[in-house]
Amino acid sequence: MSYGDSREKILSAATRLFQLQGYYGTGLNQIIKESGAPKGSLYYHFPGGKEQLAIEAVNEMKEYIRQKIADCMEACTDPAEGIQAFLKELSCQFSCTEDIEGLPVGLLAAETSLKSEPLREACHEAYKEWASVYEEKLRQTGCSESRAKEASTVVNAMIEGGILLSLTAKNSTPLLHISSCIPDLLKR
């Protein structure tokens, strides 16, 4: 296993486990086992330990989700349709409960925001980054800056809540309900 391989495998395993089990439910030994990387490589690549690994996992998810949102928004001229396209894509993961990926950063944010300032900040930056994609599209289509900022925050909160509700329901109905409300939300 090469230098980059080992690091990427550790980060990939950690990202998936943090999404599914949270920060406190995920142990370093489990990450090592699932990644297949040598134990010493974890601290070599992540000298800051579990917290550094979690921050990098959040940053990976931030970029991954930002790109998914951007792709959906760019494919549509209407911001509401772009958001609905993202919600449709997101809701597909709930059609098979074995494939559910968990919360992109929500679980980590809820668990650690009061205990780890660097991890809280990483989660906050992820949410800001995602909101900025919605906000930019809304401004491009004539929405005022203040209204675009407000609407993007509401959309982000609705989606994060919808993911949580869909996880507990083990279906995509909450996300689909949110999707149907998006056009009216953006009209006001």
Swiss-Prot record:
Protein name: HTH-type transcriptional regulator LmrA
Gene from which this protein is expressed: lmrA
Residues in the DNA-binding region annotation: 27-46
Keywords: DNA-binding, Repressor, Transcription, Transcription regulation
Gene3D superfamilies with a match to the protein in the record: Tetracycline Repressor, domain 2
Sequence ranges assigned to domain HTH tetR-type in this UniProt record: 4-64
Pfam families: TetR_C_13_2, TetR_N
Biological role: Acts as a repressor of the lincomycin-resistance (lmrAB) and yxaGH operons.
Sample GO molecular function, one term: DNA binding
